[in-house]
Amino acid sequence: MLGWALTFLIIAILAGVMGFGGIAGTAAGIAKIIFFVFLVLLVLSLVANAIRGKGPKV
């Protein structure tokens, strides 16, 4: 039980440092870029499978 308390304490400290240190805004910007990159890759994959005549696996 003490191990879990220490683990969550460390996680809380790291979250506080990232949140108050300005890293959160940068991380959010990077996450948006990665989201759109993978969205484009998804669309390309769907188009490529449609051209080949393969349907999505269900």
Curated annotation (Swiss-Prot):
Keywords: Cell membrane, Membrane, Transmembrane, Transmembrane helix
Source domain of life: Bacteria
Family under the similarity heading: Belongs to the UPF0391 family.
Disulfide bonds: none
Pfam family for this entry, one: DUF1328
GO cellular component terms listed in the entry, alphabetical order: plasma membrane
Keyword Nucleotide-binding annotated: no
Residues spanning the membrane: 4-24, 27-47
Keyword Transmembrane helix attached: yes
The protein's name in its UniProt record: UPF0391 membrane protein Patl_4137
Membrane topology recorded in Swiss-Prot or TrEMBL: Multi-pass membrane protein
Places the protein is found: Cell membrane
